[in-house]
């Protein structure tokens, strides 16, 4: 191979993860034709077919699967090398790239980051707030070292490792003065009689489907209001305006933070909690990863959301 083009590596990783040139091109913000040309150039450079294209779509060849793992690690090392002079100028000896979900940020996230910074002041924390699908892609492609997420999340191959730190309990968000606000607990059957406010399924399809199964079983809510807002606080503002009811998560035994115009009520039946924790790649090479995970466990144990090992 005459030279290494890490841009082509990134292009290949995107196609390998999406298994679809159109979605990969959209993710990379480039034209699909240009992406196809770059992948062909890469295959000529390595003298191997990495992708199998047919009417059914795109599949990785055996050579492609082997190359994907190496390409991810190469891109990660290149990114670290490019960052090292900048870090050295600031007196830092390393960088840890931490992803956080913008959909529903676990309350523990900020405290874990703060505890790590206090113990390792010479390591720079780089925060990347993203939607959950982008976080898992970032872990798989080594663009992120670790992420604090709400589960469940999309499955990838190989699957990331996961350490649960705590759980959320689901509560119903109701406009103040609404008939359901008079109840101590809300029957699930009542949810089907109201307009249900939620974000787009594309943000986290696995979580979206999981919550629908919990709340509605196999029945689709007859009236939905899909809003573009991915942050819980913004979605709850639609509830406060009386447009419908919604869903929120709160740590067990903790009342949800008050919001003008909104009241929170538990469901009348026990519902499975929603877990949150840290995810990382089994082949991640960051020298600070293990320390971050250990600190995350310590913080969770100290706050009572995780039982000591």
Model-derived regions, located:
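N-terminal short secondary-structure element
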Residues: 1-38, 54, 67
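A short LG(V/I)-centered, amphipathic sequence patch enriched
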Residues: 43-60, 65
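Central regulatory/effector-binding core of bacterial HTH transcription factors
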Residues: 93-155
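Secondary-structure junction motif
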Residues: 107, 184-188, 194-219, 250, ...
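A late-sequence structural motif
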Residues: 108, 262-306
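Hydrophobic hinge/microswitch elements
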Residues: 131-144, 150, 200-263
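Beta-alpha-beta core module
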Residues: 156-163, 168, 233-283
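Flexible hinge/capping segments at coil-to-helix
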Residues: 161-170, 174-196, 281, 290
